[in-house]
From Swiss-Prot:
Cofactor: Mg(2+); Mn(2+)
Family indicated by similarity: Belongs to the PP2C family.
Function: Involved in the regulation of phytochrome signaling. May regulate phytochrome-interacting factor 3 (PIF3) through the dephosphorylation of phytochrome.
GO molecular-function terms, A-Z: metal ion binding; protein serine/threonine phosphatase activity
Deletion phenotype: Abnormal hypocotyl elongation under continuous red light.
Name this protein carries in UniProt: Probable protein phosphatase 2C 9
Principal cellular location given in the protein's record: nucleus
GO CC field: nucleus
InterPro entries, alphabetized: PP2C, PPM-type-like_dom_sf, PPM-type_phosphatase-like_dom
Subunit structure: Interacts with phytochromes (via N-terminus).
Length: 281
């Protein structure tokens, strides 16, 4: 279990869990580098954003594991995902032959485990955006909620995740017996509570929510330069293009990640802010 868990070593981390932290790393060959930065928002609760950024070797393959988990109503669920989700994906027996199916199954099993342990984990929940890089050549990206993945390739910027919002998934929420509120001055919410339509956890709303991920793949080649994962603390105040401009311009990925979180603060983002920048060349 431990080899799948993706905490960065203390020598690579600056800051503490409660306020802000950043770090960096690279692949064994040193060709692919990553950096991350997390900053606590202005809300009066503990930091609810968690991340993964690590390279591991398993069965003669090098895997890059990157993720952002944005919790709500507590940090227990994103902390659980940080420890367990990638492990559960890689434990699927058919991962190496059918990554898409394995990722989908592991998302479902992990959500069921969270719901079964709600007495310990509470009734909160979390978004997730995960990226698995296989041997530096193939990317598998999955997400639930509004944490986002954006890829820069050949000068083009592509969003590799889907923002799961109540407004766009109203019909499926209503089919499950829920409703979408749309009060003046507020974003649409599931049953007047949750601003995302898919999430891990949220036991009290689960009958109206999905944890099924959207999954996309991409081939990494000489034209692929940057992958950016971030929570909505960035996306509420920056477009994909604005965020990627910083990620591409600042060549050191840790410095790029810190510049992104700093820019979100300058734009008065109130939420927890987190991002992982992966630079391929």
């Amino acid at each position: 279990m431990g080899k799948f868990c993706c905490f960065t070593s203390a020598s690579e981390v600056v800051g503490g869990q409660s306020s802000s932290r950043s770090g960096k790393g690279r692949s064994d060959e040193g060709m692919i580098k990553y950096g991350f930065s997390l900053v606590k928002g202005k809300a009066n609760h503990p930091m609810e954003d968690y991340h993964v950024a690590n390279f591991i070797n398993i069965q003669d393959h090098e895997l890059g594991l990157f993720a952002i988990y944005d919790g709500h109503m507590g940090d227990s669920v994103p902390a659980y995902l940080q420890k367990r989700l990638f492990s559960n994906i890689l434990k699927e027996g058919e991962f190496w032959v059918d990554p898409r199916r394995s990722i989908a199954k592991a998302y479902e099993k992990t959500d069921q485990a969270i719901l079964s342990n709600s007495s310990d984990l509470g009734r909160g929940g979390s978004t997730a955006v995960t990226a698995i890089l296989i041997n530096g050549r193939k990317l598998w990206i999955a997400n639930v909620g509004d944490s986002r993945a954006v890829l820069s390739h050949g000068g083009a910027i592509t969003q590799m995740s889907t923002d799961h919002e109540p407004r766009t998934e109203r019909s499926s929420i209503e089919d499950r017996g829920g409703f979408v509120s749309n009060l003046p001055g507020d974003v649409p919410r599931v049953n007047g509570q949750l601003a995302v339509s898919r999430a891990f956890g949220d036991k009290g709303l689960k009958t109206h929510l999905s944890s099924e991920p959207d999954i996309k793949e991409a081939t990494v080649d000489s034209q692929t330069d940057v992958l950016l994962l971030a929570s909505d603390g960035i996306w509420k105040v920056m477009t994909n293009e604005e965020a990627m401009e910083i990620a591409r311009r600042v060549k050191d990925p840790q410095k790029a990640a810190k510049e992104l979180t700093a820019e979100a603060l300058r734009r008065e983002s109130k939420d927890d802010i987190s991002c992982v920048v992966v630079r391929f060349r």
